[in-house]
Amino acid sequence: MLSASENRFEIDLDLVFHSYQDAHLINNIFFNNEALWRSNLKVWIDYVRRNDNYLCPAIVRSVNCLSIGLQFTDDKSIMKINQQWRAKEEPTDVLSFPVIDQDSIAPPPNHFLELGDIIVSVQTAQKQADENNHSLDKELCWLVSHGLLHLLGWDHLNEHSLDQMLSFQDKLLQINHDSQIAVSRGLQP
C-alpha cells in the first residue's frame, strides 16, 4: 500500500457541479460546497490512480486533466432519469453515467478527459442516512464515491463484486476522513 505522499499525481479536476435546488430546506451546507466535492473527488481519484491493485482504466492513470459532472437532485427528478435510462419507475440513491471504457483514446495534452456524470438524490440520501443512523454528509460521500467507482469501471454484478466495491468505498471514505483531519491540523494530506 502506498502512503499518501508517495507517487502523487497532480490532478486538474474540472467539476461540473449542480447544487440541490432545495438546499435551503435542509440544514446542511456540505452538499452544496463545490470546493469540498472537488477536493474529495481529487483525493479519491488520486488514491485509485496510484495503487495498481485497484481497477482503474489505463487512460485515467495516464492523464492529469479529468472532468466529472456531479448533480444533487430530488427523488422526483432522479426517478425520471432512472425511468428513462434504466426502465425503472422508482427513485434511486445514485446514478452514474460513465463515458470512458478500455478502448477510450487519450485527449490531446492539456485537454480534459470526461469521466462521466454522477447524480445523487438528496432526499433518498437523507432517508438512508436516517435508516443507518449516520449523517447526511457521510451518506452523500458514500453515494458519490460509489458513483465515482462506476465511472472508473467498477460494477457489482454479483454479491462478491458488490462486497469488494463496498469495502473499497470504506477505504475511500477513510482516506477522505484522514485528509480532512490533516488539513484541519495544517498538514498536507
Curated annotation (Swiss-Prot):
CC per GO annotation: cytoplasm
| Keyword Hydrolase listed | yes
Task: Give UniProt keywords alphabetically.
Answer: Cytoplasm, Endonuclease, Hydrolase, Metal-binding, Nuclease, Ribosome biogenesis, rRNA processing, Zinc
Which SUPFAM superfamilies does this chain map to?
Metalloproteases ('zincins'), catalytic domain (SSF55486)
Positions with a binding annotation for Zn(2+):
146, 150, 156
| UniProt keyword Hydrolase present | yes
Domain of life from the UniProt record: Bacteria
User: Cellular location of this protein?
Assistant: Cytoplasm
- EC number(s) on record? 3.1.-.-
Task: Name the GO terms of the biological process aspect.
Answer: rRNA processing
Per UniProt, the cofactor note for this protein states: Binds 1 zinc ion.
User: What exactly does this protein do?
Assistant: Single strand-specific metallo-endoribonuclease involved in late-stage 70S ribosome quality control and in maturation of the 3' terminus of the 16S rRNA.
Record-given protein name: Endoribonuclease YbeY
Query: To which species is this protein native?
Result: Prochlorococcus marinus (strain MIT 9211)
**Originating gene:** ybeY
